[in-house]
Regions:
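Aromatic-rich peripheral "rim/lid" segments of glycoside hydrolase catalytic domains that contact
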Residues: 371-375, 385, 396-403, 407-471, ...
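Surface-exposed, glycine/proline- and aromatic-rich loop segments on solvent-exposed faces
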Residues: 471-588, 650-674
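Active-site groove signature of glycoside hydrolases
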Residues: 144, 152-156, 171-239, 260-272
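Aromatic-lined substrate-binding rim segments of carbohydrate-active enzymes
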Residues: 92-173, 248-259, 264, 329-334, ...
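C-terminal motif of bacterial Sec signal peptides marking the signal peptidase cleavage site
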Residues: 16-19
Length: 712
C-alpha cells in the first residue's frame, strides 16, 4: 500500500510540474490569445538553451518540447526599510518567504534590476529545487546610475560607461552560472555565488531608463559606426547609441556562449520617454525628443535564444498618455476609455520580436505625484484599487499580445524619493523612516509599515490608548498622543456635546503664529499647524503661511504661482491649506491649449478605518469619529518632520535662504475651540538609532492571485 501511495504521489507531482508551462488546456477564461502555444524544435547548435524568444512569446524547453510560457511576475527591489543600495542586507529567510508568496500569487517570474545579495541566489536555487513550479528569473544588468549625469555620454573618451557596463555584464554572467567569488557586494568584499541557476533564467535586460539628454549626447558622436559583432549587428539606420547597445549585448552573448555554452534571450531596456513613436500632443519636449529603437539591433543565425524588447510602461506619465487624442478616445472591449491599451497596441506594431512590459505599477501612497485621465494615478489609491487597476492594466498587456508583464514592485522601499516631495535621507539608513506622501515608496504588493506592529488602528475606539498617553485632561476634552516612525497619532474624547469646530494646534519648529486671525483662537506657543476638526464637515490640517513649503517652493522660489509677500512674514496669524504639486503648466500642441499648474489639498483628511482586518479597511484614510471619540493619524511629512527618530524637521527656509534641516527635541500640542487661548503641552521626541517596521501583504495580493490564475 505504501508503495502504491508513493507512486501516486510521484505521478501527481510530475503532473503538477508539467502543468507549470504546458498550454494544452487553455480555457475560455484565459486572458492570453490562444495562438502560438508551441513551436517546432530549436537548433541549439550545441548550446544549453532553456528559453527562446520567438514571434510574440517566450518558449520553454520542456523535455525537448517547446511550450509557450507567459511571463507574469514582479519586480523585486534590493532593499528593506532600513537598508540601502550599498548594503541591502535582505536575509535568506526573507527571500525564501517572498518566493513562496510570489508563487502562491500565481506569478511565475521574478525580475531584478541588477546583481543581488548572495542570499537571493542561494534562496532562489534552494526554492526552485523543491518547488513543484519553479520560478523564472529576469536578470537586469546596469551600471552606476550616477554616470548618466556625471559622465552624461555612453561613448565618453575614457570609456567609463562602457567599461562599467562590460564589467557588470561579466560579473552577472559568472554569478548566474555559480562561478563567482570576486564580486564586491555591499559590505562583502568577495561575495561567493556558487549555484548555477542559469536554467531558470528566462532573459537578461540590459540598461536603465535612459534620460533623453544622455541618449542625445551619445548620438552626437556621428563618427560612431554601426556595430557588427559575432551574434548581434546593427541595421544601417542605427544611431550611435543603438550601436553602443548592440556592442554591449553582443559582448554578453559572446561571453556566456564561449564561457558556459549557454544562450539566454536578451533585451535592452526602454521606456515611454525614448520609445520609437512620436507623440504630437506631448507638452514636455524632453519626453518626446529622441528615440531608442532596438529594432535597429538584429541577431544573426549564431544566436539561437533570440532578442526581445522590454519597456517600462506606466499609465499616468508621460503626459501624452493623458492627452494624445487617439489614445484617450480609444475604447476597450468593455467600452471604457483605455489610453494604456491604445498605446500598447500602437507600440507593439514597431517590433518584430516579443515585447515585455518590464515595469507596470500603481502606488498606494497617501501622496499623489501624477494624475491619470482615467484615475490610474501615481498615488492616492486604496489597496483594493491597486489590485483591480493592475488587473485591468495586465489584461490590456496580455490581450495585446505582449510576452509578459512585470508588476512594480514586490516590496515597498523607504529610501525612494519622489519629484514632488522634499528630499531627505538620514546618514544612517538604520534610522530611516517612511514618507507616506512619497508615491515612489508605495508601489509594493508587500506593505512595509512603521513600528514593530500597528500601534494604533484608526477606528474611533480608545482601547489602544493608555493613561500615559493622555497629555491633556480638561473639563471639556481628553487629548491623547503617541507616534511611530510614520505618523503622529492623536485621540480626542469629548466630555460634553460640542457643536462647533475643535482645534488642535501643533508646534514643531516653532516659527508659526501665536494667534489665528480667521478662526479667532490664540496659543501660548508659536504654532506651526492647526488640526481643524469638523464633526459634520471637512476636517483638515492647516499650516502657518510662513511655514508652508508649497508656497515657498512653488511661489517664492520657482515663481510657478504669484506669491503673497505676507507669507514670508512671521507671526502673521494666517493659516493656509497644505497643498501638493502634481504638474507644471502644460501647453498641448495639438489642442493649442495651455493647462495651468496642477495641485491638490494634501492636508484635507479622509474619514475611514485603518484596521487591515476590517472589511471597511482603507489605507488612504486619516481619521475616524465615533460619537464623542475621534482618532487621527497625521503623516509626519505633513508636519515638515523628515525623520521622527532623530527629530529632523525642515528649517526656517526664509531665514536660511533655502530648504535645509535642523533637529528638535519635542512637539507642543493643545486643544480648544473658537475664542480660546489654548495652552500647549510638550511631547518629547525620543531619539532612536534603529527604526522598526513590520510587513504585511496588501489587499491587492489576493486580487492579483485570483486574476493571475487566468493568465496561461
Amino acid at each position: 500500500m505504501k508503495k502504491i501511495v508513493s507512486i501516486m504521489l510521484i505521478f501527481a507531482m510530475m503532473t503538477v510540474t508539467v502543468s507549470c508551462s504546458k498550454n494544452d488546456n487553455i480555457s475560455e477564461k484565459n486572458i492570453v490569445p490562444d495562438k502560438e502555444t508551441t513551436i517546432e524544435s530549436v537548433d541549439m547548435d550545441g548550446n544549453n538553451i532553456e528559453f527562446v524568444a520567438q514571434g510574440d512569446y517566450f518558449y520553454h524547453n520542456d523535455n525537448k518540447k517547446w511550450n509557450r510560457v507567459i511571463l507574469k511576475g514582479v519586480n523585486m527591489g534590493l532593499t528593506l526599510a532600513t537598508t540601502n543600495l550599498n548594503n541591502p542586507d535582505v536575509s535568506y529567510e526573507t527571500y525564501m518567504e517572498w518566493f513562496k508568496q510570489i508563487s502562491e500569487m500565481n506569478a511565475n517570474t521574478v525580475k531584478v534590476f541588477t546583481i543581488m545579495n548572495p542570499d537571493f541566489y542561494q534562496a532562489f536555487y534552494d526554492y526552485n529545487k523543491k518547488a513543484e513550479c519553479p520560478l523564472y528569473l529576469i536578470q537586469g544588468i546596469w551600471f552606476n546610475e550616477d554616470y548618466l549625469y556625471d559622465v552624461a555620454d555612453a561613448l565618453d573618451a575614457d570609456n567609463i560607461v562602457a567599461d562599467a557596463f562590460e564589467r557588470n555584464i561579466t560579473e552577472t554572467i559568472d554569478i548566474i552560472h555559480g562561478n563567482s567569488d570576486y564580486t564586491s557586494y555591499g559590505n562583502i568584499k568577495n561575495a561567493v555565488y556558487h549555484n548555477d541557476i542559469s536554467k531558470y533564467v528566462a532573459g537578461y535586460i540590459l540598461g536603465l531608463e535612459w534620460p533623453a539628454e544622455f541618449v542625445q549626447n551619445t548620438n552626437s558622436h556621428t563618427d560612431r559606426e554601426a556595430y557588427f559583432g559575432e551574434y548581434l549587428e546593427n541595421t544601417n539606420d542605427a544611431t550611435p547609441f543603438e550601436s553602443f547597445l548592440c556592442e554591449m549585448g553582443d559582448k554578453l552573448i559572446s561571453y556566456e556562449t564561449q564561457s558556459y555554452k549557454t544562450q539566454i534571450p536578451v533585451a535592452f531596456l526602454n521606456w515611454q520617454t525614448t520609445d520609437a513613436l512620436k507623440h504630437s500632443n506631448e507638452p514636455f519636449e524632453e519626453e518626446d525628443s529622441v528615440s531608442v529603437n532596438t529594432e535597429n539591433i538584429k541577431s544573426n543565425e549564431s544566436y539561437k535564444a533570440g532578442l526581445f524588447a522590454a519597456l517600462d510602461i506606466y499609465p499616468y506619465y508621460p503626459e501624452f498618455m493623458n492627452h494624445q487624442k487617439e489614445y484617450v478616445d480609444y475604447k476597450d472591449s468593455n467600452g471604457q476609455s483605455n489610453p494604456y491599451e491604445a498605446y500598447l497596441i500602437d507600440l507593439k506594431k514597431e517590433y518584430t520580436v516579443p515585447v515585455m512590459v518590464a515595469e507596470v505599477g500603481l502606488p498606494t501612497s497617501r501622496g499623489i505625484a501624477h494624475e491619470s485621465v482615467v484615475g490610474y494615478n501615481q498615488g492616492g489609491l486604496t489597496e483594493k484599487q491597486q489590485g483591480e487597476y493592475l488587473t485591468n492594466l495586465l489584461t490590456s498587456i496580455y490581450k495585446s499580445g505582449y510576452a509578459g508583464g512585470m508588476i512594480f514592485s514586490w516590496q515597498e522601499e523607504w529610501f525612494k524619493q519622489t519629484w514632488n516631495t522634499v528630499k531627505y535621507a538620514p546618514e544612517n539608513p538604520e534610522c530611516r523612516t517612511p514618507n507616506v506622501m512619497s508615491a515612489e515608496q508605495g508601489y509594493g504588493i508587500v506593505a512595509v509599515e512603521p513600528g514593530e506592529n500597528q500601534i494604533c488602528k484608526i477606528d474611533g475606539k480608545l482601547d489602544e490608548w493608555s493613561d500615559s498617553e493622555n497629555i491633556i485632561d480638561s473639563d471639556e476634552y481628553k487629548l491623547y498622543s503617541k507616534y511611530d516612525e510614520g505618523y503622529l497619532y492623536l485621540a480626542v474624547q469629548l466630555k460634553s456635546k460640542t457643536d462647533g469646530k475643535i482645534y488642535v494646534p501643533i508646534s514643531t519648529l516653532g516659527v508659526g503664529s501665536q494667534k489665528d486671525n480667521t478662526r479667532n483662537i490664540a496659543f501660548d506657543k508659536n504654532t506651526d499647524y492647526i488640526l481643524e476638526i469638523d464633526k459634520n464637515g471637512e476636517t483638515r490640517l492647516l499650516t502657518d503661511a510662513y511655514y508652508s513649503t508649497f508656497h515657498y517652493i512653488y511661489g517664492y522660489s520657482k515663481g510657478v504661482f504669484d506669491f503673497d509677500n505676507d507669507y514670508s512674514v512671521k507671526n502673521s496669524g494666517e493659516y493656509v491649506r497644505i497643498q501638493m504639486f502634481t504638474s507644471n503648466e502644460m501647453y498641448l500642441p495639438d489642442d493649442n491649449k495651455t493647462i495651468e499648474p496642477q495641485f491638490y489639498e494634501s492636508g484635507l483628511l479622509k474619514l475611514g478605518i485603518t484596521d487591515p482586518d476590517s472589511d471597511k479597511f482603507d489605507n488612504t484614510v486619516d481619521y475616524y469619529i465615533a460619537d464623542n471619540t475621534m482618532e487621527f493619524r497625521i503623516p509626519w511629512y505633513l508636519l515638515n518632520v523628515m525623520n521622527s527618530t532623530q527629530g529632523t524637521v525642515i528649517n526656517d527656509f526664509y531665514s536660511e535662504g533655502s530648504i535645509n534641516f535642523t533637529n528638535i527635541k519635542e512637539l507642543n500640542i493643545g486643544i480648544g475651540k473658537a475664542g480660546d487661548n489654548i495652552e500647549m503641552k510638550s511631547i518629547p521626541l525620543e531619539e532612536k538609532q534603529q527604526s522598526s517596521y513590520h510587513t504585511r501583504l496588501k489587499k491587492s495580493y489576493e486580487i492579483l492571485k485570483e486574476y493571475l490564475k487566468k493568465v496561461k
